Design a protein with these regions (language model features):
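Bacterial N-terminal signal peptides that target proteins for export
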Residues: 2-12
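Flexible, surface-exposed loop/linker segments and immediately adjacent secondary-structure boundaries
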Residues: 103-148
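Gly/Pro-enriched, hydrophobic low-complexity segments
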Residues: 28, 131-221
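N-terminal leader/targeting segments and the immediate start of mature chains
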Residues: 2, 24-62, 211-225
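An acidic-aromatic
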Residues: 67-119, 189
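Bacterial N-terminal signal peptides
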Residues: 11-21
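Envelope-exposed proteins and targeting segments
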Residues: 45-47, 64-66, 72-74, 84-86, ...
């Protein structure tokens, strides 16, 4: 089940250069780190990764997993395979959400999409991390999952009314291994990224969607089940 409709408006994310020789430390300068993140993603054409998405809030705890594909400019595809199949994708202009076996598919222009995942598509573009996340800073009070990683915090532009903070965990080689979105209602969504592969060949057809025959197309800005 996709959680809270707007879970993509995250804006850019955090990393170091691939060839950074020194491990990240709590003393890392935020401005320098943000610049390295921007440079890293500016040179990335595609990204493929396994992901785990965990939601907790309102007495609900839910974990899903699947494969994420991203391609410049602004295209991404989330293929959920556990606990049941479903697909979210965007070609940079239109976003689609479809659960196989259902009689309808949801569609909306990307510019109208109200979901916290959507800004992830800007990772493979000319992004400026410090401009995308208000109050970007180190989060020494939040322990990273893996030794050597650094955790940053900030609030996505224009989302302070619903987002308490967004946490970004960065690995020593400059990859984002985790994103945590903590909302003002007390709920939290965590994305973990594994087996990340950069600049692999991803066909454009992966970001196109044709509704199966007999499927109703429903317009809307929120993608929930």
């Amino acid at each position: 089940m996709i959680i809270a409709p707007y879970r993509w408006n995250l804006a850019a994310v955090v990393l170091l250069l691939l060839f950074c020789s020194n491990p990240l430390t709590a003393q890392t300068d935020v401005h320098t780190l943000a610049g390295k993140v921007d440079q890293r993603y500016d040179h990335m054409r595609t990204l493929e990764a396994r992901f785990t998405e965990t939601y907790s809030g309102a007495g609900i705890n839910r974990t899903e997993s699947g494969t994420l594909l991203m391609k410049r400019p602004g295209r991404m595809r989330w293929d959920y395979d556990q606990p049941r199949p479903k697909v979210f994708l965007t070609d940079g202009h239109t976003a689609w959400f479809y659960v196989p076996g259902e009689k309808q598919v949801r569609r909306t222009p990307v510019k109208q999409l109200d979901d916290l995942r959507s800004p992830l598509r800007y990772l493979l573009g000319k992004t400026k991390l410090e401009k995308e996340l208000d109050g970007l800073s180190l989060a020494p009070d939040r322990k990273p999952l893996n030794p050597g990683d650094v955790v940053l915090r900030g609030v996505p532009n224009g989302m302070g009314d619903r987002i308490e903070q967004t946490l970004l965990e960065v690995t020593p080689d400059g990859l984002i291994s985790r994103i945590v979105i903590e909302e003002r209602d007390g709920s939290a969504t965590e994305f973990r990224f594994l087996q990340q592969k950069e600049n692999v060949e991803i066909p454009d057809r992966q970001f196109r969607f044709t509704p199966p025959p007999g499927t109703e197309v429903v317009a809307g800005t929120e993608f929930t089940e």
